[in-house]
């Protein structure tokens, strides 16, 4: 990057997310914030984003955990983040990677891809949660970081908006599941559609409700080997299906 105004948007395949804020550990640190969206859904990829802000520029107002924002507000902030970030990258891990690695390792992969895809190399990466992927730079896990560290908040917004848009595209191809309404989460509507139609190729067959529907109806798509993820209520609400502030 030759200047802060150089295009710095990058979207890559794969998974692992990290975020870092502006409370630099040292004056010379380049801090990156990372977060993910889509651990709990029964369908679609897990998406991660990494964001670096320029500490010399005013901070964007209204940044917060994506779960407390309406869809309209997230879209507005998304545009501001990609316009004003010093660097950012959005990455994902596919359904196939989730099923082969498990959702935790796929999430770490998406985060790692997001950090490594940045056009500016950070010296410190702050990641929402209690785990960090293996990186070549310093990293720090921040529990509740999406509400505490502005660059993590920004990453949570980029990841959430990007994934929601992906699921809208999947809805166009597979309208019977209602991906436009629940973004792949295990709502009663989605579970009923799974029971009636069985899973499509975008469903995570390592997740118990999908596996059960597959075994009940059969879809011609092989089941993955390994452990089955039992979806809990916590997973169903892990990263913003239904904003805390109400439906957007």
Curated annotation (Swiss-Prot):
It is found in: Cytoplasm. Keywords: Cytoplasm, Endonuclease, Hydrolase, Manganese, Metal-binding, Nuclease. Residues 29-219 form the RNase H type-2 domain. It is an enzyme of class 3 (hydrolase). One of its GO terms (cellular component) is ribonuclease H2 complex. It catalyses: Endonucleolytic cleavage to 5'-phosphomonoester. The keyword Membrane does not apply. One of its GO terms (molecular function) is RNA-DNA hybrid ribonuclease activity. It comes from the Bacteria. Its EC number is 3.1.26.4. SUPFAM superfamilies: Ribonuclease H-like. Its cofactor is Mn(2+); Mg(2+). CDD domains: RNase_HII_bacteria_HII_like. A divalent metal cation binds at residues 35-36, 128. Manganese or magnesium. Binds 1 divalent metal ion per monomer in the absence of substrate. May bind a second metal ion after substrate binding. GO terms for biological process: DNA replication, removal of RNA primer; mismatch repair. NCBIfam families: PRK00015.1-3 (NF000595), PRK00015.1-4 (NF000596). Belongs to the RNase HII family. HAMAP family: RNase_HII_B. Endonuclease that specifically degrades the RNA of RNA-DNA hybrids. This is Ribonuclease HII. It comes from Paraburkholderia xenovorans (strain LB400). The gene is rnhB.
């Amino acid at each position: 990057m030759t200047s802060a105004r150089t295009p710095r948007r990058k979207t890559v395949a794969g998974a692992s997310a990290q975020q870092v804020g502006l409370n630099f550990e040292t004056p010379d640190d380049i801090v990156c914030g990372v977060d993910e969206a889509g651990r709990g859904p029964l369908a679609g990829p897990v998406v991660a984003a990494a964001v670096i802000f320029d500490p010399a520029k005013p901070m964007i107002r209204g940044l917060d955990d994506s779960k407390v924002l309406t869809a309209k507000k997230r879209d507005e902030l998304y545009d501001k983040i990609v316009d004003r970030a010093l660097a950012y990258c959005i990455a994902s891990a596919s359904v196939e990677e989730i099923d082969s690695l498990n959702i935790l390792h796929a999430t770490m992969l998406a985060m790692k891809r997001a950090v490594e895809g940045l056009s500016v190399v950070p010296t410190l990466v702050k990641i929402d949660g209690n785990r960090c992927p293996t990186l070549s730079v310093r990293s720090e896990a921040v529990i509740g970081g999406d509400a505490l560290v502005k660059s993590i908040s920004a990453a949570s917004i980029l990841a959430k908006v990007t994934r929601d848009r992906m699921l809208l595209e999947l809805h166009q191809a597979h309208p019977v599941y209602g991906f436009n309404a629940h973004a792949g989460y295990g709502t009663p509507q989605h579970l009923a559609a799974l029971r009636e139609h069985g899973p499509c190729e975008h469903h995570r067959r390592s997740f118990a409700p999908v596996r059960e529907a597959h075994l009940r109806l059969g879809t011609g798509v092989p089941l993955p080997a390994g452990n089955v993820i039992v979806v809990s209520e916590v997973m169903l609400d892990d990263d913003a299906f239904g904003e805390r502030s109400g439906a957007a």
